[in-house]
Amino acid sequence: MPGHLQEGFGCVVTNRFDQLFDDESDPFEVLKAAENKKKEAGGGGVGGPGAKSAAQAAAQTNSNAAGKQLRKESQKDRKNPLPPNVGVVDKKEETQPPVALKKEGIRRVGRRPDQQLQGEGKIIDRRPERRPPRERRFEKPLEEKGEGGEFSVDRPIIDRPIRGRGGLGRGRGGRGRGMGRGDGFDSRGKREFDRHSGSDRSSFSHYSGLKHEDKRGGSGSHNWGTVKDELTESPKYIQKQISYNCSDLDQSNVTEETPEGEEHPVADTENKENEVEEVKEEGPKEMTLDEWKAIQNKDRAKVEFNIRKPNEGADGQWKKGFVLHKSKSEEAHAEDSVMDHHFRKPANDITSQLEINFGDLGRPGRGGRGGRGGRGRGGRPNRGSRTDKSSASAPDVDDPEAFPALA
Protein backbone atom coordinates (compact mmCIF):
# COMPACT_ATOMS: atom_id res chain seq x y z
CA MET A 1 0.00 0.00 0.00
CA PRO A 2 1.54 3.35 -0.94
CA GLY A 3 2.41 5.62 1.96
CA HIS A 4 2.55 2.71 4.42
CA LEU A 5 5.93 2.25 6.12
CA GLN A 6 7.40 -1.23 6.32
CA GLU A 7 7.69 -2.28 9.94
CA GLY A 8 10.51 -4.81 9.54
CA PHE A 9 12.92 -6.01 6.91
CA GLY A 10 15.80 -8.47 6.72
CA CYS A 11 18.42 -9.97 4.43
CA VAL A 12 20.18 -13.32 4.22
CA VAL A 13 23.86 -13.26 5.20
CA THR A 14 26.13 -16.26 4.85
CA ASN A 15 29.57 -16.04 6.54
CA ARG A 16 31.97 -18.75 5.47
CA PHE A 17 34.34 -18.03 8.40
CA ASP A 18 31.67 -18.07 11.07
CA GLN A 19 32.48 -21.62 12.25
CA LEU A 20 36.18 -20.92 12.84
CA PHE A 21 35.57 -19.00 16.06
CA ASP A 22 33.17 -21.55 17.54
CA ASP A 23 35.91 -23.67 19.09
CA GLU A 24 36.62 -22.56 22.67
CA SER A 25 39.17 -25.30 23.43
CA ASP A 26 42.84 -24.50 23.99
CA PRO A 27 45.00 -25.08 20.85
CA PHE A 28 47.75 -26.58 23.02
CA GLU A 29 45.35 -29.22 24.26
CA VAL A 30 44.35 -30.04 20.69
CA LEU A 31 47.99 -30.49 19.67
CA LYS A 32 48.66 -32.59 22.76
CA ALA A 33 45.72 -34.83 21.95
CA ALA A 34 47.06 -35.37 18.42
CA GLU A 35 50.45 -36.36 19.82
CA ASN A 36 48.81 -38.76 22.25
CA LYS A 37 46.98 -40.45 19.38
CA LYS A 38 50.28 -41.00 17.61
CA LYS A 39 51.75 -42.44 20.80
CA GLU A 40 48.82 -44.82 21.17
CA ALA A 41 49.23 -46.02 17.60
CA GLY A 42 52.96 -46.59 18.09
CA GLY A 43 52.52 -48.23 21.50
CA GLY A 44 49.86 -50.64 20.21
CA GLY A 45 52.16 -51.97 17.51
CA VAL A 46 55.02 -52.57 19.92
CA GLY A 47 53.60 -53.72 23.22
CA GLY A 48 50.26 -55.35 22.47
CA PRO A 49 46.92 -54.71 24.21
CA GLY A 50 48.47 -54.32 27.69
CA ALA A 51 50.85 -51.71 26.46
CA LYS A 52 48.03 -49.98 24.63
CA SER A 53 45.96 -49.61 27.78
CA ALA A 54 48.97 -48.32 29.73
CA ALA A 55 49.74 -45.85 26.96
CA GLN A 56 46.15 -44.64 27.01
CA ALA A 57 46.33 -44.06 30.75
CA ALA A 58 49.66 -42.24 30.46
CA ALA A 59 48.34 -40.11 27.61
CA GLN A 60 45.26 -39.23 29.63
CA THR A 61 47.36 -38.15 32.62
CA ASN A 62 49.71 -36.20 30.36
CA SER A 63 46.85 -34.34 28.71
CA ASN A 64 45.21 -33.56 32.05
CA ALA A 65 48.45 -32.32 33.63
CA ALA A 66 49.34 -30.24 30.59
CA GLY A 67 45.89 -28.71 30.53
CA LYS A 68 46.07 -27.81 34.21
CA GLN A 69 49.54 -26.34 33.91
CA LEU A 70 48.62 -24.23 30.88
CA ARG A 71 45.53 -22.95 32.64
CA LYS A 72 47.46 -22.10 35.79
CA GLU A 73 50.26 -20.37 33.91
CA SER A 74 50.02 -16.71 34.80
CA GLN A 75 50.65 -13.71 32.65
CA LYS A 76 53.79 -12.94 34.69
CA ASP A 77 55.37 -16.27 33.66
CA ARG A 78 54.71 -15.52 30.01
CA LYS A 79 56.39 -12.12 30.28
CA ASN A 80 59.47 -13.59 32.03
CA PRO A 81 60.36 -16.83 30.22
CA LEU A 82 63.03 -19.14 31.56
CA PRO A 83 66.60 -18.88 30.19
CA PRO A 84 67.55 -20.99 27.19
CA ASN A 85 69.84 -23.35 29.15
CA VAL A 86 66.79 -24.67 31.01
CA GLY A 87 65.45 -27.23 28.58
CA VAL A 88 62.16 -28.94 27.97
CA VAL A 89 61.71 -32.70 27.73
CA ASP A 90 63.25 -34.19 24.63
CA LYS A 91 60.81 -35.46 22.05
CA LYS A 92 62.60 -38.78 21.85
CA GLU A 93 61.87 -39.47 25.49
CA GLU A 94 58.24 -38.45 25.03
CA THR A 95 57.66 -40.65 21.99
CA GLN A 96 59.39 -43.66 23.54
CA PRO A 97 56.80 -45.83 25.28
CA PRO A 98 57.47 -46.46 28.95
CA VAL A 99 56.48 -50.16 28.71
CA ALA A 100 59.09 -51.03 26.06
CA LEU A 101 61.61 -51.78 28.82
CA LYS A 102 59.53 -54.69 30.10
CA LYS A 103 59.66 -56.45 26.76
CA GLU A 104 63.46 -56.51 26.71
CA GLY A 105 63.54 -57.89 30.24
CA ILE A 106 65.18 -54.87 31.79
CA ARG A 107 63.95 -53.90 35.19
CA ARG A 108 62.54 -50.43 35.32
CA VAL A 109 64.03 -48.20 37.97
CA GLY A 110 61.76 -45.84 39.88
CA ARG A 111 61.91 -42.28 38.70
CA ARG A 112 63.08 -39.40 40.74
CA PRO A 113 60.63 -36.57 41.36
CA ASP A 114 62.18 -34.39 38.70
CA GLN A 115 61.96 -37.22 36.15
CA GLN A 116 58.31 -37.77 37.00
CA LEU A 117 57.65 -34.12 36.32
CA GLN A 118 59.59 -34.56 33.12
CA GLY A 119 57.24 -37.32 31.99
CA GLU A 120 54.27 -35.10 32.68
CA GLY A 121 55.55 -32.45 30.26
CA LYS A 122 56.66 -29.96 32.90
CA ILE A 123 59.59 -27.59 32.27
CA ILE A 124 62.54 -28.63 34.39
CA ASP A 125 66.20 -27.78 34.87
CA ARG A 126 68.47 -30.27 33.05
CA ARG A 127 71.61 -29.28 34.93
CA PRO A 128 73.19 -31.88 37.23
CA GLU A 129 72.89 -31.60 40.96
CA ARG A 130 75.26 -29.32 42.80
CA ARG A 131 78.09 -30.91 44.66
CA PRO A 132 78.35 -30.14 48.35
CA PRO A 133 80.99 -27.50 49.14
CA ARG A 134 84.42 -28.76 50.01
CA GLU A 135 85.54 -28.79 53.57
CA ARG A 136 88.03 -26.09 54.33
CA ARG A 137 91.27 -27.63 55.35
CA PHE A 138 93.97 -25.63 57.05
CA GLU A 139 97.47 -26.99 57.33
CA LYS A 140 98.33 -25.30 60.60
CA PRO A 141 96.59 -23.02 63.05
CA LEU A 142 97.70 -19.42 63.31
CA GLU A 143 99.86 -20.05 66.35
CA GLU A 144 102.02 -22.64 64.54
CA LYS A 145 103.02 -20.34 61.66
CA GLY A 146 106.59 -19.25 61.28
CA GLU A 147 108.11 -16.17 62.67
CA GLY A 148 107.66 -12.89 60.88
CA GLY A 149 104.08 -13.76 59.88
CA GLU A 150 105.07 -15.71 56.74
CA PHE A 151 102.54 -18.25 55.60
CA SER A 152 103.56 -21.68 54.37
CA VAL A 153 103.55 -22.28 50.63
CA ASP A 154 104.02 -26.07 50.73
CA ARG A 155 100.45 -26.91 49.83
CA PRO A 156 99.84 -27.68 46.12
CA ILE A 157 97.89 -25.26 44.00
CA ILE A 158 95.26 -27.87 43.02
CA ASP A 159 93.74 -27.96 46.50
CA ARG A 160 93.04 -24.26 46.47
CA PRO A 161 89.48 -23.27 45.60
CA ILE A 162 88.77 -21.46 42.37
CA ARG A 163 88.45 -17.72 42.88
CA GLY A 164 86.64 -15.21 40.69
CA ARG A 165 84.00 -16.18 38.16
CA GLY A 166 82.56 -19.65 38.41
CA GLY A 167 83.94 -20.27 41.89
CA LEU A 168 82.29 -22.07 44.75
CA GLY A 169 80.22 -19.03 45.68
CA ARG A 170 77.26 -19.78 43.43
CA GLY A 171 77.71 -23.27 42.00
CA ARG A 172 79.61 -24.67 39.02
CA GLY A 173 79.48 -22.86 35.72
CA GLY A 174 77.62 -19.87 37.07
CA ARG A 175 78.79 -16.30 37.37
CA GLY A 176 80.10 -16.83 40.85
CA ARG A 177 81.98 -14.24 42.81
CA GLY A 178 84.47 -16.59 44.33
CA MET A 179 84.46 -17.95 47.78
CA GLY A 180 82.85 -15.71 50.38
CA ARG A 181 85.21 -14.05 52.84
CA GLY A 182 82.66 -12.91 55.37
CA ASP A 183 84.31 -14.92 58.15
CA GLY A 184 87.55 -12.95 57.71
CA PHE A 185 89.61 -16.00 56.70
CA ASP A 186 89.92 -18.14 53.57
CA SER A 187 91.88 -21.28 52.72
CA ARG A 188 95.07 -19.36 51.94
CA GLY A 189 95.17 -17.68 55.32
CA LYS A 190 94.58 -14.04 54.32
CA ARG A 191 93.07 -11.76 56.92
CA GLU A 192 90.27 -9.49 55.88
CA PHE A 193 90.93 -6.73 58.39
CA ASP A 194 94.66 -6.30 57.70
CA ARG A 195 95.85 -3.12 56.02
CA HIS A 196 97.88 -3.72 52.89
CA SER A 197 100.64 -1.39 51.83
CA GLY A 198 103.47 -1.51 49.31
CA SER A 199 106.02 -2.69 51.84
CA ASP A 200 103.60 -4.96 53.79
CA ARG A 201 104.72 -3.32 57.00
CA SER A 202 101.24 -3.02 58.42
CA SER A 203 99.88 -6.40 57.27
CA PHE A 204 102.39 -8.39 59.35
CA SER A 205 102.67 -5.95 62.24
CA HIS A 206 101.26 -8.51 64.66
CA TYR A 207 103.98 -11.03 63.85
CA SER A 208 107.10 -9.08 62.91
CA GLY A 209 106.97 -6.69 65.86
CA LEU A 210 106.65 -3.50 63.77
CA LYS A 211 104.47 -0.83 65.28
CA HIS A 212 101.49 0.32 63.30
CA GLU A 213 101.56 4.04 62.50
CA ASP A 214 98.49 6.07 61.72
CA LYS A 215 100.66 8.63 59.90
CA ARG A 216 103.33 8.09 57.32
CA GLY A 217 106.10 10.09 58.91
CA GLY A 218 105.79 13.04 56.53
CA SER A 219 106.49 11.13 53.30
CA GLY A 220 104.56 9.64 50.41
CA SER A 221 101.14 10.40 49.03
CA HIS A 222 98.27 11.12 51.41
CA ASN A 223 100.76 12.60 53.83
CA TRP A 224 99.36 13.48 57.26
CA GLY A 225 102.63 14.49 58.91
CA THR A 226 104.33 12.68 61.74
CA VAL A 227 103.21 11.64 65.20
CA LYS A 228 105.61 14.17 66.74
CA ASP A 229 103.74 17.08 65.18
CA GLU A 230 100.87 16.73 67.62
CA LEU A 231 103.28 16.56 70.55
CA THR A 232 104.98 19.80 69.53
CA GLU A 233 101.65 21.64 69.50
CA SER A 234 100.76 20.67 73.08
CA PRO A 235 101.23 23.36 75.82
CA LYS A 236 103.34 21.03 77.98
CA TYR A 237 105.85 20.61 75.19
CA ILE A 238 106.05 24.40 74.70
CA GLN A 239 106.71 24.94 78.42
CA LYS A 240 109.48 22.37 78.36
CA GLN A 241 111.10 24.06 75.37
CA ILE A 242 111.00 27.43 77.13
CA SER A 243 112.62 25.97 80.25
CA TYR A 244 115.31 24.26 78.17
CA ASN A 245 116.09 27.46 76.28
CA CYS A 246 116.36 29.46 79.51
CA SER A 247 118.69 26.88 81.04
CA ASP A 248 120.87 26.90 77.92
CA LEU A 249 121.15 30.70 78.03
CA ASP A 250 122.11 30.65 81.72
CA GLN A 251 124.78 28.05 81.15
CA SER A 252 126.22 29.95 78.19
CA ASN A 253 126.46 33.15 80.28
CA VAL A 254 128.20 31.29 83.10
CA THR A 255 130.74 29.77 80.72
CA GLU A 256 131.61 33.22 79.35
CA GLU A 257 132.13 34.73 82.84
CA THR A 258 134.18 31.89 84.37
CA PRO A 259 137.74 31.28 83.22
CA GLU A 260 138.72 28.04 81.55
CA GLY A 261 140.37 26.37 84.57
CA GLU A 262 137.46 26.73 87.02
CA GLU A 263 134.55 24.39 87.41
CA HIS A 264 130.97 25.54 86.78
CA PRO A 265 128.61 25.52 89.75
CA VAL A 266 125.68 23.16 89.25
CA ALA A 267 122.34 25.00 89.29
CA ASP A 268 119.54 23.48 91.23
CA THR A 269 116.44 22.29 89.38
CA GLU A 270 114.23 24.04 91.92
CA ASN A 271 115.74 27.42 91.08
CA LYS A 272 115.10 26.78 87.37
CA GLU A 273 111.47 25.96 87.99
CA ASN A 274 111.06 29.10 90.11
CA GLU A 275 112.56 31.21 87.33
CA VAL A 276 110.20 29.72 84.75
CA GLU A 277 107.22 30.44 86.99
CA GLU A 278 108.37 34.04 87.53
CA VAL A 279 108.66 34.54 83.78
CA LYS A 280 105.12 33.27 83.33
CA GLU A 281 103.71 35.47 86.12
CA GLU A 282 105.16 38.68 84.65
CA GLY A 283 102.62 38.60 81.83
CA PRO A 284 102.68 40.94 78.84
CA LYS A 285 105.14 43.82 79.07
CA GLU A 286 103.57 47.30 79.01
CA MET A 287 105.16 50.52 77.72
CA THR A 288 104.11 54.00 76.76
CA LEU A 289 103.75 55.28 73.23
CA ASP A 290 106.90 57.40 73.49
CA GLU A 291 108.95 54.40 74.61
CA TRP A 292 107.62 52.33 71.75
CA LYS A 293 108.42 55.08 69.22
CA ALA A 294 111.94 55.39 70.62
CA ILE A 295 112.49 51.66 70.19
CA GLN A 296 111.15 51.81 66.66
CA ASN A 297 113.44 54.72 65.75
CA LYS A 298 116.46 52.83 67.04
CA ASP A 299 115.64 49.78 64.99
CA ARG A 300 114.78 51.78 61.88
CA ALA A 301 117.62 52.22 59.38
CA LYS A 302 118.43 55.85 58.63
CA VAL A 303 118.32 56.79 54.96
CA GLU A 304 121.26 59.00 53.90
CA PHE A 305 121.03 60.89 50.63
CA ASN A 306 124.18 61.83 48.73
CA ILE A 307 123.29 65.46 47.90
CA ARG A 308 125.71 67.39 45.62
CA LYS A 309 126.90 70.70 46.97
CA PRO A 310 127.08 73.83 44.72
CA ASN A 311 130.18 74.12 42.47
CA GLU A 312 131.18 70.61 43.47
CA GLY A 313 133.13 68.90 40.70
CA ALA A 314 133.18 72.01 38.44
CA ASP A 315 135.95 72.26 35.81
CA GLY A 316 138.35 75.21 36.28
CA GLN A 317 138.82 76.02 32.59
CA TRP A 318 135.36 77.61 32.32
CA LYS A 319 135.77 80.10 35.19
CA LYS A 320 136.58 83.02 32.85
CA GLY A 321 133.65 82.47 30.56
CA PHE A 322 130.90 85.09 29.94
CA VAL A 323 127.56 85.26 28.13
CA LEU A 324 127.42 86.66 24.59
CA HIS A 325 124.42 88.88 23.58
CA LYS A 326 123.41 89.79 20.01
CA SER A 327 123.57 93.47 19.03
CA LYS A 328 120.37 95.41 18.20
CA SER A 329 121.65 96.56 14.80
CA GLU A 330 121.98 93.00 13.59
CA GLU A 331 118.42 92.24 14.62
CA ALA A 332 117.00 95.28 12.74
CA HIS A 333 118.89 94.37 9.58
CA ALA A 334 117.58 90.83 9.72
CA GLU A 335 113.96 92.06 10.01
CA ASP A 336 114.31 94.31 6.93
CA SER A 337 115.68 91.48 4.84
CA VAL A 338 112.76 89.26 5.83
CA MET A 339 110.16 91.94 4.89
CA ASP A 340 111.75 92.58 1.51
CA HIS A 341 111.77 88.95 0.71
CA HIS A 342 108.07 88.36 1.39
CA PHE A 343 106.40 91.52 -0.07
CA ARG A 344 108.25 91.90 -3.34
CA LYS A 345 105.71 92.02 -6.28
CA PRO A 346 106.31 91.13 -9.92
CA ALA A 347 105.98 93.72 -12.70
CA ASN A 348 102.93 92.12 -14.36
CA ASP A 349 100.86 91.90 -11.18
CA ILE A 350 97.24 92.98 -11.85
CA THR A 351 95.70 92.06 -8.53
CA SER A 352 95.62 95.68 -7.43
CA GLN A 353 93.45 96.60 -10.43
CA LEU A 354 90.71 94.06 -9.67
CA GLU A 355 87.58 95.15 -7.75
CA ILE A 356 85.81 92.41 -5.84
CA ASN A 357 82.38 93.10 -4.29
CA PHE A 358 80.95 90.17 -2.38
CA GLY A 359 77.59 91.72 -1.40
CA ASP A 360 76.24 92.54 -4.90
CA LEU A 361 76.48 89.05 -6.34
CA GLY A 362 73.19 87.11 -6.61
CA ARG A 363 72.85 83.38 -5.99
CA PRO A 364 73.96 81.71 -9.18
CA GLY A 365 73.25 78.12 -9.98
CA ARG A 366 69.80 76.69 -9.26
CA GLY A 367 67.52 79.46 -10.52
CA GLY A 368 63.80 78.98 -10.81
CA ARG A 369 62.15 75.59 -10.38
CA GLY A 370 59.31 76.12 -12.86
CA GLY A 371 58.32 73.62 -15.47
CA ARG A 372 57.84 70.58 -13.23
CA GLY A 373 54.23 70.03 -14.15
CA GLY A 374 51.67 68.12 -12.10
CA ARG A 375 52.33 65.34 -9.61
CA GLY A 376 53.58 62.27 -11.31
CA ARG A 377 53.93 63.87 -14.71
CA GLY A 378 57.21 64.97 -16.09
CA GLY A 379 60.51 65.16 -14.27
CA ARG A 380 63.04 67.80 -13.51
CA PRO A 381 63.74 70.32 -16.28
CA ASN A 382 66.76 69.89 -18.46
CA ARG A 383 70.08 71.22 -17.34
CA GLY A 384 70.22 73.63 -20.27
CA SER A 385 67.06 75.49 -19.31
CA ARG A 386 68.48 76.63 -15.96
CA THR A 387 70.79 79.18 -17.56
CA ASP A 388 67.88 80.94 -19.30
CA LYS A 389 65.73 81.17 -16.19
CA SER A 390 68.54 82.36 -13.99
CA SER A 391 68.67 85.63 -15.97
CA ALA A 392 65.11 86.56 -14.80
CA SER A 393 65.34 88.52 -11.51
CA ALA A 394 63.24 87.47 -8.55
CA PRO A 395 60.28 89.72 -7.68
CA ASP A 396 60.60 92.10 -4.75
CA VAL A 397 58.48 90.92 -1.88
CA ASP A 398 58.19 94.34 -0.26
CA ASP A 399 56.89 96.01 -3.46
CA PRO A 400 53.04 96.19 -3.38
CA GLU A 401 52.89 96.76 -7.14
CA ALA A 402 54.47 93.40 -7.83
CA PHE A 403 51.45 91.72 -6.22
CA PRO A 404 48.31 93.67 -7.30
CA ALA A 405 45.91 90.90 -6.21
CA LEU A 406 46.94 91.31 -2.60
CA ALA A 407 46.38 95.10 -2.54
Curated annotation (Swiss-Prot):
The keyword Membrane does not apply. GO terms for cellular component: cytosol; nucleus. There is a cross-link at K102, K211, K228, K280 (Glycyl lysine isopeptide (Lys-Gly) (interchain with G-Cter in SUMO2)). Residues 164-182, 362-371 have a biased composition (Gly residues). InterPro entries: HABP4/SERBP1-like, HABP4_PAIRBP1-bd, IHABP4_N. There is a cross-link at K52, K102, K228, K280 (Glycyl lysine isopeptide (Lys-Gly) (interchain with G-Cter in SUMO1)). GO terms for molecular function: mRNA 3'-UTR binding; ribosome binding; SUMO binding; translation elongation factor binding; translation repressor activity. Residues 70-80, 89-114, 122-162, 183-199, 261-274, 281-291, 327-341 have a biased composition (Basic and acidic residues). The modification N6-acetyllysine is found at K52, K68, K122, K140, K211, K328. Residues 33-227, 242-291, 327-407 are annotated as: Disordered. Keywords: Acetylation, Isopeptide bond, Methylation, Phosphoprotein, RNA-binding, Translation regulation, Ubl conjugation. The keyword Calcium does not apply. It comes from the Eukaryota. GO terms for biological process: negative regulation of translation; PML body organization; ribosome hibernation. SMART domains: HABP4_PAI-RBP1 (SM01233). Ribosome-binding protein that promotes ribosome hibernation, a process during which ribosomes are stabilized in an inactive state and preserved from proteasomal degradation. Acts via its association with EEF2/eEF2 factor, sequestering EEF2/eEF2 at the A-site of the ribosome and promoting ribosome stabilization and storage in an inactive state. May also play a role in the regulation of mRNA stability: binds to the 3'-most 134 nt of the SERPINE1/PAI1 mRNA, a region which confers cyclic nucleotide regulation of message decay. Seems to play a role in PML-nuclear bodies formation. PANTHER family: HYALURONIC ACID-BINDING PROTEIN 4, SERPINE1 MRNA-BINDING PROTEIN 1. Associates with mature 80S ribosomes. Interacts with EEF2/eEF2; interaction sequesters EEF2/eEF2 at the A-site of the ribosome, thereby blocking the interaction sites of the mRNA-tRNA complex, promoting ribosome stabilization and hibernation. Interacts with SPIN1. Interacts with CHD3 and TDRD3. Interacts with ZDHHC17 (via ANK repeats). This is SERPINE1 mRNA-binding protein 1. It comes from Oryctolagus cuniculus (Rabbit). The lineage of its organism: Eukaryota, Metazoa, Chordata, Craniata, Vertebrata.
